Amino acid sequence: MTENSVAKEIVDVAYRIHTVLGPGLFESVYEAVLASELQKRGLQLARQQPIPVVCEGTRFEMGFRADLVVEDKVIVEIKSIAEIAALHKKQLLTYLRLADKRLGLLINFNVVLIKDGISRIVNGLQE
């Protein structure tokens, strides 16, 4: 599967979850349900996957934890907050660079319309 086809599956499941559960739950609930539904579709994923950081030649095993890494291609960062800030998008871009991945999805479930809560972040594009 390509990054785009994986992302399409993730977005489709996110829409379904938001329709059924609505906004206002803890991030951990959305993460668990999203992971379960993606696995039902046959997608491989890791939850709370530690991603190491290398800084000036020193490797730190616990740089950060990715909420979900799907098919070893797409990092999903899940939020349930009032508003996504530019910092959240930059944070996901940093995760993508450190994990050497090209595509990330920032999904905020605490919105009226889920389409307003999904941001696609691509590593490697000029800003």
Give short role names for the model-derived ranges.
Residues M1-V20:
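Interdomain/boundary linker segments immediately adjacent to catalytic/signaling cores
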Residues F26, E31-K73, I81-A82, V112-L125:
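Active-site metal-binding core of divalent-cation-utilizing nuclease and nuclease-like domains
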Residues K79-E127:
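Nucleic-acid nuclease catalytic cores
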Residues A7, V11, L34, K89-L92:
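Alpha-helical structural signal
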